[in-house]
Amino acid sequence: MAIHSFETMGTMVSIRIADAELGEHTTDDRAIAVLNEIEHEFARLNEKYSLYRDDSEISAVARGDISLADASEELREEYARALEWREKTDGAFTPHRPDGIIDLSGTIKAVAIESAAKQLTDAGFVNFSVNVGGDLTTSGNQAADESGWITGIVDPQDRGTVISAVRLNAEFPAMATSGSVERGEHIWLRPETTKDFVQATVIAQDIITADVLATAIISGGQATLDQITQNFAVAVMTVSPDGTLQANPLFQELVAQ
């Protein structure tokens, strides 16, 4: 298995390709080429959408140096996508900070993961995982004698403890966890929402859906959780401040045995 890691977007990216081998004496030129392309795309998206960079396009929009109407077509399309998710979640997910600044970090990381998976598929790889700060998408199998990919979910109160392990498969290959474990507090609660959950994990058919809905659950609390489990075919597990776990039936079906 080829394993490649690098830092970007304030977190760690880990790519595992079960179809390839990388080492000091054996190399896979196809894997090396696509991994370089993936790093480049992550860097490009970070340079374009990071509000921590003064030279990013999104920062220029935030400062008013350019209007949204004059921004690149790609940025406007990503903003439109985020607005669609705000509509689908009744506002629990939003591309706006409390001060009104457009912040697309809630979708861009997932966009980068999705792009990496497409690049790997286009390069001919079938069995791989792309993990970015605990959010991941998978394809195929982890090993010849394994079905799907097994991944753990950490305890938000003790990062050295795994509270559950699930098997991602062809129907539900993507998983995202929101809360304060991997990257600190970064989600804005609705004014009327108490902090019902300190962590939410969503498993879905694609990483963008998983990431957005996990964020929405943290932001919107129990009411949003109920809405999502009724309206979306996703697996969900939440952790309350007192450590109580909630998992819907679909999540329980994916728990690794």
Model-derived regions: residue spans:
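Mature catalytic core of soluble alpha/beta enzymes
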Residues: 1-257
